[in-house]
Amino acid sequence: MFARHERRGGRGGRGSGRGSGWNRGGQGRGGRPGSSFPAGLRGKEIGLYFARRGRARKEWAAAHQKVAVSIDPESQQDLQQIIHSISLEEGPSHERLDSINAVAVEYLSSAPTRLGTRGVGGELKLERNAALDEKLYQSLEAKAQSREYQSMLDFRKKLPAYTMREQIIEVIESNRVVVISGETGSGKTTQVPQFILDSYIQKGMGSLCKVICTQPRRISAISVAERVAAERAEQCGDSAGYHIRLECRAPRDRGSILFCTTGILLQQLQGDPYIMGASHIILDEVHERDLQTDFLSIILKDLLAVRPDLRVILMSATINAELFSDYFGNCPRLEIPGIAFPVEVAYLEDVLEQIGYRGNSVYSRNAGIHWKDRKKFESMIQDAMPFIRSLEGKYSHRTLDTLSEWNELCIDLDLVHALISEICTKKPEGAILVFLPGWEQISELNKRLKADSGLRGSSLIIPLHSMMPTVNQRQVFDRPPSGVRKIVLATNIAETSITINDVVYVIDCGKIKMSNFDVDKNLATLDAEWVSMANAQQRKGRAGRVQPGVCYRLYTSWRESQLEAYQLPEMLRTRLETLILKIKILKLGSAEAFLQKAINPPSSEALHLSLQFLITLKALNEDETLTPLGYHLAKLPLDPQTGKMIIMASIFSCLDPILTVAASLSFKDAFMVPLGKERLVDEAKKRFAGNTKSDHIMLVNVFSQWEEAVKKRDGNEFCYANYLSWNTLKMLSNMRQQFAEYLHELNFIGSQDIKAREYNQNSDNLKVLQAVICSGLYPNVAKGQFKNKRLVRCSTKTDAKAALHPKSVNVSQCGFDTQWFVYYTKIRSTKTFLHDVTPVYPIPLLLFGGFFRHSGDTITLDDWITLQCDDNLAELIKDLRQEFDRILERKIGAPGILAGTISANQRRLLAAIIKVLSTETAFVPEMPDNAFDEDDMDVQVIDET
């Protein structure tokens, strides 16, 4: 589509690998790294030097960095004439606005009946059907006589849950809400729904039973449904089935069990707010405290007041079952014992003592502490000293000395390597599972182990990460040949999402990558944090699945005593925009009042930030009511910004490529990163991007070229040559079609044909695509600062310094012709990174931007984006914004009746806007040499993901 990408040959080696990064050179006397100052300065003089330099930068930027807005004279004249014609034919602006609002109100009043009917509950109300009851009973009785069913039943009877069958049925029948807890392997997920269903069928009431069991992950919903169907000697889709996004094998309407993702049940609420088609709702894995499950818990608690016949069962790990019981009015709790062998726990002090590790690497040596972390390190050691002294006489002086300078801020991969070698040479057979925080540690440890001649030939090393090819990871479930030890390097995905049965040894490094939201800085963060006790227990449990095991915790027993009981609930560490739109579309009242009913309510500050963001996005009015745009965004299975983007794509006739962008942003890009091939993957991305300098358009080119390869029956080779996942691309294809179906049902497009010419007249127009991406991502805007047209650093409204993420195609790029960028997310990890970036020109910012102020020769948007513009053009742009907003209000407020609401002149105006967007040019102001510190470089720092 853009900048044709020629396929390279097959995959080769990585070559020399990544370079050593930017060499910062020397430091000024007493100065910090990257903050040098002239020699000879002392004390106050140093501060004055930096203050003068800061003032000089600001003065220069104010004088030179305003980019001029430019529209050619002919286009200006056309726009003025069209705007004038519109004002003559439609009357005063307030009358036009009243007309638009009337149409929108009429549209929205009838809209709810058209969507939200993709339910999981089947019939709206369960009513007794004697004939069906008898049929279900006879079917179950006949099936129970089969050899296949009896074989499965023998297995089921060995599960701890089955031994409590009568007790479980009794407590569910006697109580409206029950909490059932049990460790992995107890059988609660597969058995409890069957106990309920079989009890109803055997009592001749099968027609009154419909069990819906939510799962936090897609793969869990599928695998559990298929397992339950097998245990019932049936095909999936008979009495047990599943429903996940883009895939459904639903069971019969009555006398059945449906396993679905939590999001699917929330979607059902739009068409069936009382879930009348369900007799029992089971929330599984509630201890994970994901956002959607906590949200659904609030709804179910309220729903119990109007559904006296509904039964709610919450299933949890044992560690915090009491919390959910308290939330639901001290409802009964049942605990199912798990199947687990004893697991010995060894702490850091034990490991150091056992293997004689001295800690002589940069990970643990005091000299390896960065100056920024020095105080934190010293405080950490001071806190631990009483514990270290308590070990005197129990451990060697060598161990105590090592502990007294141990750096907990890092993962000591030398120690992990040494411990693995110790296990491989001295311990009985059994797989080793190593828990690491992220990609960087997995990659580095994998490299070290592969280079270890002592392990070569006698070990099978399997890195496990979402960025890696799944074909290699399938080995994780297979037992290796005799004499070969399996070593799995994984993130927290191996805590609950997968089970590796032959693991005997677990090495827990004690850290986990957690996404959080810094309310004060309005910034997402991704940092390595200490695990919770819940995480630690889950990790320990991986070692005792099939025989006694050992869990090596590479942190002290004192550190364990400081761990939190569980990780912070997702509702307290994420943005709330999507949740607020759900509250509004379900008519649940004030967002703040509703969320105050949560188990752990979010802060009022976090809620206010999200409300203001939705108001800026024009999804909510100031009184917190849904706008027509907000109504549509709430209906779409996308975050608000991406949802707005695809709506704008339907208006600007560039549907196909923008659907690809939306699918990739809401799921993931299709690239897989084999260990050792990181640089080759980066090069492939840049080839796909061509000269577009856009991470988003790069994704468009990947998908469109894959489609072409598939048509030529060359898809697999294309994926292999370019480090792409066929499964991910197929998922993106299905998501694109789903988005088109939603747009069709919302009447933004007349058919579901993504490729139809009428929806893609501007799909090959790069600048229109950039503008539409801007329309969705605003206010996520960054300003680039350049030297020799090379991007040196970025700034945002709230961050003086931000860097492009190393995975961006724009890292180290030159030749930019605009200083403005839009980005999808901003995350602070090792530094503040901008993810998924596209350059954008001034006109899209002016059209889609926020608060507009014109003074002198300057236009200011949202009090920080400044553009240079003469008075006449500024007035034209102001009028253009007003008329363009009215077009959007009409198209979004009543998409199904566009022909009657959009005049010929307004269509002319939209065409003229597209012409202006297509021909706009800009320039990049250069910064002077003294404007940058030495660390103002887009250094490729590998972010740990």
Question: How would you label these PLM feature ranges?
Answer:
Residues 431, 485, 658, 818-819:
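Short, surface-exposed beta-edge/turn micro-motifs
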Residues 764-945:
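C-terminal accessory domains/tails appended to large, multi-domain proteins
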